[in-house]
Amino acid sequence: MAARSLGSGVGRLLRGLQGRSGQSGWSLSVSRSTATRLPGCVPAAAQPGSYPALSAQAAQEPAAFWGPLARDTLVWDTPYHTVWDCDFRTGKIGWFLGGQLNVSVNCLDQHVQKSPETIALIWERDEPGTEVRITYRELLETTCRLANTLKRHGVHRGDRVAIYMPVSPLAVAAMLACARIGAIHTVVFAGFSAESLAGRINDAKCKAVITFNQGLRGGRVVELKKIVDEAVKSCPTVQHVLVAHRTDTKVPMGSLDIPLEQEMAKEAPVCTPESMSSEDMLFMLYTSGSTGTPKGLVHTQAGYLLYAAMTHKLVFDYQPGDVFGCVADIGWITGHSYVVYGPLCNGATTVLFESTPVYPDAGRYWETVQRLKINQFYGAPTAVRLLLKYGDAWVKKYDRSSLRTLGSVGEPINHEAWEWLHKVVGDGRCTLVDTWWQTETGGICIAPRPSEDGAEILPGMAMRPFFGIVPVLMDEKGNVLEGGDVSGALCISQAWPGMARTIYGDHQRFVDAYFRAYPGYYFTGDGAHRTEGGYYQITGRMDDVINISGHRLGTAEIEDAMADHPAVPETAVIGYPHDIKGEAAFAFIVLKDNISDENMVVNELKLSVATKIAKYAVPDQILVVKRLPKTRSGKVMRRLLRKIITSRGQDLGDTTTLEDPSVITEILSAFQKYEEQRAATN
């Protein structure tokens, strides 16, 4: 059944473009003939200002669409002279060239000038009922004190700063403080191991690290400072570690360590913002690829901020005075775009959720919605599937009448979870937006909203491209698939302001990863289906990347984490469907002949993955096999391993390139015994 609601954001966009300052006189008229030239582009409607007309305008005339939006939405120090200069063949991406601005001014100062006591942040701390509200004035003062502290300790424009902190006002201030002085932040999820943290610090050549003594999550204490201490032992570029206190517990302070709150208290609550060029780096965020090394994706100033703000406003139908509740961690791109930068640029009240969906019980989300009167709720399908199993009573116990929009992010949402979220959580009245985007895209690219008024929303489908996003489906030979009811590799044919600009220190890797497979197009790595109606449904990853609870992870990373074990000469990791996580990791390992205690090795491998990457990366299942299925050239055929565990070896497809086809029977037999043993112990 389709859910319906007004696509009111589109009308407001048009009115804003035509009348915000009385300066915008550009036309939205679009000819039907030009709008149909781009594959996947929605045909233009006769009505100016309709979703099809705006969508076609953004696709056909990017400068005319984005130029006025950037001019009127953002606060500029110096106007830009060129809206865009992009070439996907070389990975060249530039927006609003010649312009200068400061992101923190756009997120803080402009709102403080108008309404300083408006609530910027509601910190929903780990213990329910202990929320803290921070005004825009308070957040600006905290940001300036932190910015001055960084400068006093030698952090300046262009320096990199690692932030290893859980969701908190001080973490947000740390991000904005970096933006204010022109430093580049790289937030590392505060669940990553010391080794993963060190790898990111070293790749970015960070001068400073900002952290807490400890973190609190789900009633547990997380020893953040200990992890940082271990990490910086191998990080020669780190000159200072700024340590704040989340708990009263004292931690050892070494020669690099600086007590952050004490130092901030000495500083003035005013800091002159650096004027940054539109294409200066704002932040780096590390994400997994199909190879083993995480890549530091670079996002820049103006284009990213504009795109985050516009998608936040239009996809979620954000209106002034709303309380926006995105429960993502700031260590991921969702937290960057829809906890911090998008909402704050729009002057919104944004919720910082420190806890878990089931602490102290399975009603935590909905009790928070009731208490904080949240209007938009944005979370991951993994959490929805988990809470679904606890039943409806935990939801219905609380008043959710404040909710207008529900959002899903991180992975495709299955039909059952979509229906439960819509009917039970949203009482069948809330708009539900299943959003597709990536760390690389900077913001939402495909979602049911914005749309024309009253447009349908279909369960489990991302549906409509955002303005300026022109999806294209490719077949295996690199040909563009036209029309509806087709499936292929999801590409985007045109640049948009929010997309990443490069991989830090390795632009060729950026080009190879995203623009080489289909020259002239951005390749997302995902597959998609386009319906007869022109709607898009994401079908999942097409490369060796798995999505565990909304966290993208390369199988090669897990394999690398296990490769150092002296008893394990070979490993192969694949993803498989999981009821709660969406996907989980399944590892096949080959042991040396003299190993007698398989269980001990398996446990050691799990510990190794948790230590080198994070606990969420640990394979749910590990199967010992005598050998792996390889081609004559030595390549492991992971496709066959996936077939073995998902369909018991049925429909294996072409196996003629296998060096020894009998390996399939061998692994099938081992898997069957493994399953029997698991069934007997459960």
Swiss-Prot record:
Activity regulation note: Inhibited by acetylation at Lys-635 and activated by deacetylation mediated by the deacetylase SIRT3.
Induction, as annotated: By fasting.
Annotated positions binding ATP: G410, E411, P412, D434, T435, W436, W437, Q438, T439, D526, R541, R552
EC number: 6.2.1.1, 6.2.1.17
A Pfam entry, by short name: ACAS_N
GO cellular component: mitochondrial matrix; mitochondrion
Modification note: Reversibly acetylated at Lys-635. The acetyl-CoA synthase activity is inhibited by acetylation and activated by deacetylation mediated by the deacetylase SIRT3.
Reported tissue expression: Highly expressed in heart, testis, kidney, skeletal muscle, lung and spleen. Detected at low levels in brain.
Complex and partners: Interacts with SIRT3.
Function: Catalyzes the synthesis of acetyl-CoA from short-chain fatty acids. Acetate is the preferred substrate. Can also utilize propionate with a much lower affinity. Provides acetyl-CoA that is utilized mainly for oxidation under ketogenic conditions. Involved in thermogenesis under ketogenic conditions, using acetate as a vital fuel when carbohydrate availability is insufficient.
Protein name as annotated: Acetyl-coenzyme A synthetase 2-like, mitochondrial
